[in-house]
Amino acid sequence: MKESMSKTRVAINGFGRIGRTILRILLLSDTDIEIVAINDLGDYQTLAYLLKYDTVFGVLKEDVRIENKKLIVGNNGYNIKLISERDPSLIPWKELDIDIVIEATGAFANRESLEQHINAGAGKVILTVPPKDEIDATIVLGVNEEVLDGSMQLISNASCTTNCLAPI
């Protein structure tokens, strides 16, 4: 991770429903997180369209366009590199100086596949689905977030079902 004064550099692997929702939340938040890159195999124009026109969240107010393999959102400099790489071990996380990869494809959910992001240069991986085998931690906010520490590299935020039931 970077010094406390710099932003945390994050990449999203998988720009489906979860990946797009994460980006929308971060766009609307005042946070020290910088979305640096998105890796998805879809057509870039289609990805931009799906971000702009969401059936659940509605139309994103900011302008969304593709320029030179970058997703440009708004006029304030959201300039996100787009990558289309099927193999996580070949994604240039080290070159991009990525602190955290948000793994949102659903395809990589075991320790071995998640470690490919670490081997490619990412500092940590947050899995958006339940893991298929043992990783460093599965965290449910409001239940066990106190076990999370900075040494953990592979964590999961459980599942949408688990998180919706946690407050009960």
Where do the model's predicted regions map?
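N-terminal Rossmann-like NAD(P) cofactor-binding subdomain of oxidoreductases
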Residues: 2-168
